[in-house]
Swiss-Prot record:
Residues on Cytoplasmic side: 163-244
Region (Homodimerization): 32-42
Primary residence: membrane
Disulfide bond positions: C45-C108
Leader peptide range in chain numbering: 1-21
Effect of N227Q: Complete loss of binding to GRB2
Organism: Homo sapiens (Human)
Name under which the protein is recorded: T-cell immunoreceptor with Ig and ITIM domains
Tissue: Expressed at low levels on peripheral memory and regulatory CD4+ T-cells and NK cells and is up-regulated following activation of these cells (at protein level).
Length: 244
């Protein structure tokens, strides 16, 4: 009963400005808006340029009444939209769980005194969920790109580790080769160990003996040489004696 009285009273207010012709205010709206399927949207209108008192605001979708906000009785939501329509903020209206069928024109009708009725228009377009579409469309390529990136990173890490180990192994082999060469060179050029005193005497004794034998022969030759000289000198002396 109260619902019917509000509608009748609203119709009476709507006819009032036609007789008075004293409408000076304007309705400011968000104009054309869009929202994603499954989301929510706020329909908002604002009355300006007038000092008239707002007595009631009706929200309608084309020919369907969605909600009424009365200055004295408060909000009343149409039973067919209770699950998806919420009052506010302010004199606005919130649509929830949007579907493609919610696309269309919405009207905010301000009933004022003494100006009468002001009407604002909002066009809502409900779009398919871009998040779901883009997620489904780009999920596989994104996962593929991530997998490829991980493969590249893992390959790079493996290559770096392998090169590092190879360099370390080469350094170790190089150091070992240098050590072996140094040890071999030291063994070749190191002085031989001193022989025992007995062996040294025996080694040096043989040349001495040989030298003694060679000196004996030389001495014998010198002795013979001096004998010849003595013989000759004696011969000369005897020769001088006989001549004298």
């Amino acid at each position: 009963m109260r619902w019917c009285l509000l509608l009748i009273w609203a119709q009476g207010l709507r006819q009032a400005p036609l007789a008075s012709g004293m409408m000076t205010g304007t309705i400011e709206t968000t104009g054309n808006i869009s929202a994603e399927k499954g989301g929510s949207i706020i329909l908002q209108c604002h009355l300006s340029s007038t000092t008239a008192q707002v007595t009631q605001v009706n929200w309608e979708q084309q020919d369907q009444l969605l909600a009424i906000c009365n200055a004295d009785l408060g909000w009343h939501i149409s039973p067919s939209f209770k699950d998806r329509v919420a009052p506010g903020p302010g004199l606005g209206l919130t649509l929830q769980s949007l579907t493609v069928n919610d696309t269309g024109e919405y009207f905010c009708i301000y009933h004022t005194y003494p100006d009468g009725t002001y009407t604002g228009r909002i066009f809502l377009e409900v779009l398919e969920s871009s998040v779901a579409e883009h997620g489904a469309r780009f999920q596989i390529p994104l996962l593929g790109a991530m997998a490829a990136t991980l493969v590249v990173i893992c390959t790079a890490v493996i290559v770096v580790v392998a090169l590092t180990r190879k360099k370390k192994a080469l350094r170790i082999h190089s150091v070992e080769g240098d050590l072996r060469r140094k040890s071999a060179g030291q063994e070749e050029w190191s002085p031989s160990a001193p022989s025992p005193p007995g062996s040294c005497v025996q080694a040096e004794a043989a040349p001495a003996g040989l030298c003694g034998e060679q000196r004996g022969e030389d001495c014998a030759e010198l002795h013979d040489y001096f004998n010849v000289l003595s013989y000759r000198s004696l011969g000369n002396c005897s020769f001088f004696t006989e001549t004298g």
